[in-house]
């Protein structure tokens, strides 16, 4: 249940007064905070005020146009058809609506425009149609089931889609990630065994927080104890590659409560942990709360500093601006590929999914009803997109690559585009290097620890002048939010 602001204000004060950060951790966080020239960085655009959003694609969604429904199959010299594909499948059904979520989703109440059984049938039809146009001999390297809540599917639905995927050409070490919510697996070991027995080898659990009060504000349908039971079940099911998602800068959250969540999660020694700052979509319920209920801007920065310290204390490596792994081998391969220079082809299916085929970035319609009608009619359910030219493809390599521990490999970039990245983006790279955000070597251009901190702002540095101008006209910096949601 969503908490009214009047009640929340009282809860926040009472609970935060009773939670204190230990002195040593507070000193370490403050020491890290004091050494950064925040004002100097902000003067060059490196701050997190305004319409902050994690950058996961390029071009940004607010700059896209309508495209032909099959435009992603146009041949491209710079992005020729790959024999190694990544696949993303969107499952929009959820047990309820979180107060902050802006992804394509519907409540699984039996009244949606497309039933779950039909959705799986149509999803298979969409994948088949796309593979037929793209080239059915392409081998699948990675699969990610996202949502929504994929783990809301019934066992027979999981078996059906996984059986279909196994009929396709797959690489021997194909990575299959399945997103789960605690309320669907905390008391359902059989569902986890179904996932494992049908080829899923990586589980992503949406934990978000271990503070029950904060979870209530987020309108999550689980509590901390449910998360703990879920993690026990996931391990009992035999999964050896597990990631959890966490969110910070939430209303009602203090630095102390964030550190407590991070420490407990770290002690589980899961293979990887993803941490995201809250993205406050202006149309979501959580954005209607009074500003005083949120952590201060400075505390939001301290929370970001804190997750680096806590994860390092527990033996984790930072592998992306928002991801940590216990070993480098446990980095999610799909994320690494789609943020790289090569092997970036992403075939996506399902309502509200986005993909990149040949040189075209595309979004499927976010309306479940429209998606169903178009797939039934034999159409590709494309909504928005853009075919990228050479300049935008080079920029895409940086916009997405600046988040990763490998950065942008100079030889790989030069082999693809025929030029060293310094010759193209010398001014941008030079600025980031002078500000201490980039390390430039003979082999690669990589983010420093401070660069990781400003990964999204580094991405914006490589937006094209045309896109910057377009976003300026909209009063936006990142451009990652749609103007409105259409799910029905």
Place the predicted regions along the sequence by residue.
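Local cysteine-cluster metal-coordination motifs and their immediate loop/turn environment
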Residues: 89-105
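Basic, amphipathic "hinge/linker" alpha-helix immediately C-terminal to the N-terminal HTH DNA-binding motif
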Residues: 445-452
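A short, conserved structural fragment
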Residues: 433-443
